[in-house]
């Protein structure tokens, strides 16, 4: 009998569709063992418990925050003992699952979790934290699934709304330095996006070419601009390069940011503030169950 350990976000544990899918999978002879998280320290404890019990595959059911909790817990497990990870997307925003073509149907996602192949993928450490999807800084840290669509449009390419929105909501640029392999950026930043995968903020495409197994982050930095410079900004958003005047795009395996004041940041949607942060890709550090048509792996 095949055994998997399902760890459910407590807010989703009563989902009737999820319960039905688990029961049907058990009827097929799969031993689906269920655990539930209620508090922030539950995930690390339950992951350690699974390792002690010899579980080889963990399935987490929840949103991007739950996936982040699981990845963060797994990265602290010795590599040889680290279970594989599968995902049932149940959040408000399921950006990582969506980008990687993990089914949004609970039954189909559970079937993939049981039958799918695990591939080695990267995660990114940010000081003592980690993320598997996207870290957004500055203005970008405010962009979540609940953000008004006018604000999110900027990250989807509709930058014509940005100037008015920034003025209306009083966003101010952040002044500091960013050091990456082969370069350094000093000055004001409106938005920083450090991407392992492609989507954030409820489906906004931040890094359309990012791969989760290439050992690199896709980085986008946007510096402040004046209203008459907006056409140039839009052009650079649509045609990102390292040489953009306002929008700079590059790839790197590590970067360090140093700001006089703590920079607002979110890691897979989870808030984090720090003045100095080192981001470092952990290549192929997790084994993740993915569909065969996943566009974010090099195959």
Swiss-Prot record:
GO terms for molecular function: ATP binding; lipid kinase activity; magnesium ion binding. Keywords: ATP-binding, Cytoplasm, Kinase, Lipid biosynthesis, Lipid metabolism, Magnesium, Metal-binding, Nucleotide-binding, Phospholipid biosynthesis, Phospholipid metabolism, Transferase. Binds 1 Mg(2+) ion per subunit. Ca(2+) may be able to substitute. It comes from the Bacteria. The active site is at 270 (proton acceptor). Residues 1-130 form the DAGKc domain. GO terms for cellular component: cytoplasm; plasma membrane. ATP binds at residues 37, 63-69, 92. GO terms for biological process: phospholipid biosynthetic process. Its EC number is 2.7.1.-. Its main location: cytoplasm. PANTHER family: LIPID KINASE YEGS (PTHR12358:SF106), SPHINGOSINE KINASE (PTHR12358). Probably phosphorylates lipids; the in vivo substrate is unknown. This is Probable lipid kinase YegS-like.
């Amino acid at each position: 009998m095949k055994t998997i350990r399902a760890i459910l976000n407590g807010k989703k544990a009563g989902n009737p569709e999820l319960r039905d899918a688990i029961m049907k999978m058990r009827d097929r002879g799969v031993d689906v063992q269920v655990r539930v998280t209620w508090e922030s320290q539950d995930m690390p404890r339950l992951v350690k418990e699974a390792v002690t019990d010899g579980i080889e595959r963990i399935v987490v059911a929840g949103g991007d925050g739950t996936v982040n909790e699981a990845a963060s817990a797994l990265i602290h497990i010795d590599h040889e003992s680290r279970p594989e990870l599968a995902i049932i997307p149940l959040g408000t925003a399921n950006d990582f699952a969506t980008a990687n073509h993990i089914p949004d149907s609970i039954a189909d996602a559970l079937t993939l979790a049981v039958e799918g192949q695990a591939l080695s993928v990267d995660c990114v450490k940010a000081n003592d934290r980690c993320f598997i999807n996207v870290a957004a800084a500055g203005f970008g840290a405010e962009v979540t699934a609940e953000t008004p669509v006018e604000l999110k449009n900027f990250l989807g390419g509709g930058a014509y709304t940005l100037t008015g929105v920034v003025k209306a909501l009083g966003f101010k640029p952040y002044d500091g330095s960013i050091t990456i392999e082969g370069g350094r950026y000093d000055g004001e930043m409106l938005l920083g996006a450090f991407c392992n995968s492609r989507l954030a903020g409820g489906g906004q495409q931040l890094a359309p070419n990012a791969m989760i197994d290439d050992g690199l982050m896709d980085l986008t930095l946007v510096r402040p601009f004046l209203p008459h410079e907006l056409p140039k900004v839009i052009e650079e958003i649509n045609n990102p390069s390292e040489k953009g005047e306002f929008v700079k795009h590059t790839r790197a395996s590590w970067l360090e940011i140093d700001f006089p004041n703590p920079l607002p940041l979110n890691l897979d949607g989870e808030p984090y503030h720090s003045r100095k942060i080192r981001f470092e890709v952990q290549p192929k550090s997790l084994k993740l169950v993915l569909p065969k048509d996943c566009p974010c792996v090099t195959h």
